[in-house]
Design a protein with these regions (language model features):
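Surface-exposed, interaction-prone regions used to assemble/regulate multi-protein complexes
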Residues: 1-131
């Protein structure tokens, strides 16, 4: 798994279950993660048909480039939060320097025949450090 250091700057995402009163976030299907050095990571989760042919499945994905979000994104900004980015062909993880996972993306949930890919965002962590 490839690993490199970055400084997290801003996360924009579409969230469902957003509580405007206490500014907390719950579920995301897509996100745009921006780093201080200008790198941009776009995350998404999509439904499809299982390769097994039995029902639907989900796939998580990520692309390293700038891409707009559809809809009205919610933005969480950080004062240059240092993070570790770990990536291989099927999984991406963004962790703080204490190894707490902030964002995880799995392309297929480690199951080829019944994929259950996902985007996991540690909203408690983001709410704590949000501007």
């Amino acid at each position: 798994m490839e690993q490199f250091m970055q400084c997290l700057k801003k996360i924009s995402f579409l969230a469902y279950g957003y509580e405007a009163d206490d500014e907390s976030f719950e579920i995301a299907d897509s996100a745009k993660v921006e780093f201080v050095n200008g790198l941009v990571l776009f995350l998404s989760k999509n439904k499809s048909i299982c390769p097994s042919g039995h029902g639907t499945c989900t796939y998580g994905s990520w692309i390293w480039k700038d891409k707009p979000l559809n809809g009205n994104p919610i933005v969480a900004e950080f004062p240059s939060l240092p993070v570790k980015v770990e990536e291989d062909g099927r999984y991406l993880s963004i962790k703080d320097l204490n190894n707490r996972e902030i964002i995880a993306v799995s392309k297929d949930g480690a199951d080829y025949y019944y994929p259950d890919g996902y985007i996991e965002v540690n909203f408690d962590y983001l709410n704590k450090y949000q501007k």
